[in-house]
């Protein structure tokens, strides 16, 4: 915890700006993704109705409070989609030498923001705080540290594997062209699943979108309520923040904007905010008596180097750096 009021205020402003605004943008991508999933499943209602329905559903689920059973169902849908891409990745038989070369970091011309979006959707900033809040309730401070590390490694590994299989499948399937809707995504796995591809992708997108449409406001509410701990104010801050995030995301997704573009912009925003959140976590780790200062110093050095190099790349992409 942070006792000094000035430091707590400064960190609160950073969190409100970075995660509040960032999650509001990300929520529009969540709702847009779920709407794309419904479109793939055959729901042809015109905008803004799909987004409004999903936003209302997310708000009701947050109001009900008991989300454990729903989360398990939606996570199962997302896992099924990930499994579908894993099978498709094996079935399209990618050239292993090409896949190995792809493990070497290389950003093609005009591909920086796509790379940032990929990072932003794989390592979502608010998930770091949501995991911390969940870990505090589930694990004891010191006794279960090794189990916590194993859980983190496994969960991050599964997420990374999912991203890799999707990228490899899309690259090796031979289906080119821009992605503008769920049907374009489904074509990536049509060589394996045929006409069932649209339903597999539709269910996966809907599950992933609705899951995140609930957890993103929850995470923002948890984080901001930590600034006003104790009693009813905490509950009021949590519910008010979560409702506001859902409302903003729904209004943005309900416009006639390109949903794929909305999702991409939201992921880029997450990728840009990630260094700020990482720096905050390094600072909190530095204050912890349970973590080696030498270990934190090394992490701080890595963070600083990545921040400088990342800032340079972004400025070059914007034409502000020679």
Where in the sequence are the language-model features?
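Membrane-interface loop-to-helix entry segments
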Residues: 53, 62-92, 107, 269-274, ...
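Transmembrane alpha-helical segments of multi-pass small-molecule transport proteins
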Residues: 13-16, 41-63, 80-85, 232-251, ...
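Helix-loop-helix module between adjacent transmembrane segments
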Residues: 9-30, 38-65, 120, 207-214
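Loop-to-transmembrane helix boundary motifs in multi-pass membrane proteins
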Residues: 9-10, 47-53, 154, 158, ...
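Transmembrane-helix boundary/entry motifs in multi-pass membrane transporters
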Residues: 1-21, 40-47, 150-153, 187-198, ...
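Membrane-water interface regions at transmembrane-helix termini and the short interhelical loops
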Residues: 32-40, 55-76, 253-262, 285-289
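Hydrophobic alpha-helical segments and their helix-loop junctions in multi-pass secondary transporters
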Residues: 78-104, 115-132, 280-289, 310-321
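Extracellular/periplasmic helix-exit of transmembrane alpha-helices
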Residues: 135-136, 157-184
